[in-house]
Regions:
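Aromatic/His-enriched, Gly/Pro-containing loop or helix-boundary segments
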Residues: 10-14, 51
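Mobile, glycine-rich extracellular loop/lid and propeptide segments
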Residues: 13-17, 21-24, 29-41, 63
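N-terminal carbohydrate-binding/catalytic regions of secreted carbohydrate-active enzymes
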Residues: 1-10
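PP2C/PPM-type serine/threonine phosphatase catalytic domain
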Residues: 7-8, 34, 91-94
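Gly/Ser/Thr-rich helix-start
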Residues: 9, 32, 158
């Protein structure tokens, strides 16, 4: 337990080892894939230790030190447009990374691989992202599979949450479908490599607003008794427990 907005620290702001760091110590390969900036709260929670989630430049610097084997996401500006003037891309190259800031180029087997492909987050599905999430996931799985060492990877379908906050039904649904496609890639891998554990969960729900569905379902409401006019649900993260599904 810790406080709101903390990343990788206890309630008294002391660093606490993450699951990624623990598995690194045991010889695991590690990977992180996100649609947001790679310094955003969810990916950062696997490697960073800061007192506030918005400390993006410090989080980026810590990512360099952790040396994750494969990571992909956005957030260029936190690496090469920093207030301290540091060029973290140069530091990645000095640590023998294959770095690409333009596209998901083929990973280099003998190196760690970093893909930072947007100044902010990667575009949403309805903004023309394409198959970035499933392709990055497939690339990472192929990369890890070339070595004998086990691996740990976190893949985040980030914008399902964002669509809910924005009350944008089209965005939310398209992101769920894209995450489902990515999940299919992982399930195929698990089927071919049965000694693999897949865990699918969420860190929270995101309550939406059924008014966001009016354009798609003009005569229906997701909330019984509301009618087609719709109305707001909670605009925050509900405190309910989330499901955990596993395979393998």
């Amino acid at each position: 337990k810790t406080y709101k907005r903390a990343i990788g620290v206890s309630s008294d702001s002391l660093p606490r080892e993450t699951i990624l760091e623990q598995l690194q110590e045991q010889g695991y390969q590690t990977g992180l894939i996100s649609l947001t900036t790679i310094t955003h709260a969810t990916p950062a929670s696997f490697y960073a230790h800061v007192t506030d989630r918005d400390m993006h430049e410090e989080i980026a610097a810590q990512l360099i030190d952790v040396e994750v084997d494969f990571f992909a996401g956005g957030g260029k500006k936190f690496f090469n447009q920093r207030e301290d003037g540091k060029d973290l891309f140069a530091e990645l190259l000095s640590k023998n990374y294959h770095l690409d800031t333009l596209e998901l180029s083929k990973p280099e087997t003998g190196k760690k691989n970093a893909y930072v492909l947007a100044d902010e987050g990667i575009p949403s599905k309805i903004e023309g992202r394409g198959d970035y999430l499933s392709e990055a996931t497939k690339m990472a799985l192929d990369y890890f599979n070339q070595k004998e060492a086990p691996f740990f990877m976190m893949v985040e379908g980030s914008y399902i949450d964002w669509g809910g906050h924005a009350k944008d039904a089209e965005m939310m649904i398209s992101e769920v479908l894209d995450f489902d496609k990515t999940l299919g890639v992982v399930l195929d891998y698990v089927k071919a490599n049965p000694n693999t554990l897949l865990v699918v969960t969420a860190d929270h729900e995101t309550a939406a607003d059924d008014r966001g569905l009016r354009a798609l379902l003009p005569n229906r409401s997701l909330f019984p008794g509301r009618g087609p006019e719709g109305g707001p649900a909670a605009r925050v993260h509900p405190g309910r427990s989330r499901d955990v599904v596993r395979r393998g």
